[in-house]
Curated annotation (Swiss-Prot):
Native organism taxonomy: Eukaryota, Viridiplantae, Streptophyta, Embryophyta, Tracheophyta
Domain F-box residue range list: 37-92
Protein name per Swiss-Prot or TrEMBL: Putative F-box protein At2g39415
Superkingdom of the organism of origin: Eukaryota
Pfam families, per the entry: F-box
Provenance organism: Arabidopsis thaliana
């Protein structure tokens, strides 16, 4: 008769038992995490717009790929922020600014920031 390998701790558990327990726990944690993965989308638009207002405009626009609901949230933020010479907008062109403003929905911009270098 084969004896269970207790791993020297005297609990009689086999390596298979330990694996099964950890596997079940990992699956449960993954399932619990997946249930809450999109909780930010349940926030009201006004809160999402405030969050996006704290980001440079190009990063706020990138959130539009998250879901249909997010597609136009950035265009209702009261702040537009272009950071030209940094890593966010290399080679910022007037065409990029014009296209962004054309997609903007609000009738009034509360703040417009444009930082670029001519040369």
């Amino acid at each position: 008769m084969a004896e269970a390998d207790d791993g020297g701790n005297g609990d009689g558990a086999t390596a298979g038992d330990c694996y099964a327990h950890h596997h079940y726990r990992d699956v449960k944690l993954a399932r619990d995490a997946s249930e809450n993965i999109d909780s930010i989308s349940s926030l009201p638009d006004v809160i999402l717009q405030q969050i996006l207002s704290s980001l440079p405009t190009n990063l706020a626009i990138r959130t539009s790929v998250l879901s249909t609901r997010w597609r136009h949230v950035w265009s209702d933020t009261p702040y537009i922020y272009f950071d030209g010479p940094g890593t966010l907008y290399r080679g910022l062109k007037a065409d990029t600014i014009n296209k962004t403003l054309a997609r903007y929905k609000l009738p009034k911009i509360m703040s417009f920031h444009l930082y670029t270098k001519i040369f």
